[in-house]
Amino acid sequence: MARRTRTRRLVAAVGITALATGAALITVPQPAAVAATAAVTVRPDPSYRQEKFEGWGTSLAWFANVTGGYPEEIRQKLARLLFDDDGLALNIARYNIGGGNAPDVKDYLRAGGAVEGWWRAPEGTTREDTGWWDAKDPADWNPRADATQRWWVDRIKNDIDHWETFSNSPPWFMTRSGYVSGGFDAAQDQLKAASADDFAAYLAGATRRLEKEHGIKVDTLDPFNEPNTTYWSTRLGSDGEPVGGRQEGAHMGPELQQRVIRALAPALRASGTRAKISAMDETNPEVFARNWHSYPAEVRALVDRMNVHTYGTAGRTTVRDLAKAAGKPLWMSEVEGDWGDGQDFADMSPGLGLAQHMVDDLRELEPRAWVFWQPVEDYDNMKPGGESAKGGNWGSIQLPFSCTAEDTLDTCPIRTNTKFDTARNFTHYIKPGDRLIKVDDTSSAAAVAENGRGATVVHVNSTTAERTVTVDLSKFARVSRGATVTPVVTSAGGKLERHPAIGVTGRKATFTVPAESVTSFVVTGVSGVAEDAAVPRKDATYRLTGVHSGKHLTATETGLVVKSAGAPGGTPRWQLRGIGGATGSTRRHVITDPAGGKRLTVRATGNHAPVLEPDRAAPDQLRSA
């Protein structure tokens, strides 16, 4: 959580030319940002559809560590709010494998932050004793560890389609500082290099024990959390005892990350789990990309899925393209935030901020899944005078993390804010198995139903004025006579209010959404892809235009040149031919010069300049929206 190859590659663009490691991507022009207009038309385009969406999720970690021991009525209500169909309807859970400080270290982490590790230290062990643990010795494992977080595993396992385990820090005896809150220098590697194999065995062993004890199947294990940052440090007080940081965390630079991944692959096989490696849960796309670019091919090959956080948002499309080039699924595996100005359960600003962030992640990152950090937060931290004078809006659900076995829902109340409501506009209507599709509006996300007969558009109106939204269905091949669009609106006036279905006329339906609202438009009676929607189309020609220069790529007798629009020499045109059996966002293409019959490629050496060559070698090219 944030504190807060091939020897030849093709390159082309419709609107933007983009190069990516391992493949080149055809990138469709991005729609302009929506201003505070009184009317907007939204066009969902199923010609560009992604792989099946895996769902919505949460990390367990702190809130589960605290509330797993709460009175039954409290924890059951929480579970319903998170996982029931009327709640957030989450179907993905990430279990936190705790590191754990030494037995003689007094707890100094935030409420819930001290997730118990799976090790069992010999009696009398202190922080100075670091060489005793042996992954092969059953006596060094604690099969009853972490009972509170594991209560949640049993409670929700019938609701969960995908399990992931992850680590915030190695156990104290594998760290350089001797504490799980980070090193004394937050920029230095915290895991001892000599402990990489032990760390891998610890994570794999805990994952396999979790599976066996609870009867679940873990899909992936991510050994890192925001590793290449300077967030994680331990501070000692005047008495030499730790006083901060307040959560588990460990800096691991790219080289150490690679060492851990190399060690983890055989450790997983040896443990008996079928879990694969995911990585690296970096804090934002830009840092993720730097880490990933440093990984050699054999390390990348060991990573089954790419995980990124979006606490920073620049570079979303870079990571999207890296995942496509690598042929790997991508998750937005963690984010949270405030998006308000002081704790307020009725203010729409936090809900609108979260909703726009979700739209941007879905549109730009194109993830297979979207996962909350902690939808349940500590009310004591978030109330005015807690972590800040005004308080805050982290989490969609807040309750005190200080409740006791004697408390009830009256004395330990559960509160929800507007983020809980606007999130459900997504989680209720874009479902696992649906496919996210292109949409030409930056305030909207869209998906087609798993069966291909229906769609959903989620639109965010963050302005203080109502807005007329026209849903244009002309990109679908078939729009039935009985097609309808049903708005489901969350605003200050109500939560998920379902309005009467609107009949589709001329392939369009119009509805006026309230100010400061999130609306799910549920579309029935549509299917297929209109012939004029598909890009590229057979026998059509396209310009290749630099996104920064605005100039066109042109083939001449002497090679390739870049010309300004309207320059002498005619209008440069190219043809794009789809190949292979894939469809939608993973379809591969070859780009040819229709006049000369040659294909566009990139030099394998030197300056990697684009060149024309005879159309023969297998292309490696993908389109992105």
Regions picked out by a protein language model, each given a short descriptive name:
Residues 15, 22, 529-625:
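Lectin-like carbohydrate-binding module/patch detector with strong preference for beta-trefoil
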Residues 52-60, 90-97, 101, 162-166, ...:
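Structural recognition of the beta-strand scaffold that forms the well-ordered cores
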Residues 198-217, 227-339:
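Active-site neighborhood of glycoside hydrolase catalytic domains
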Residues 439-481, 516:
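Carbohydrate-binding surface patches
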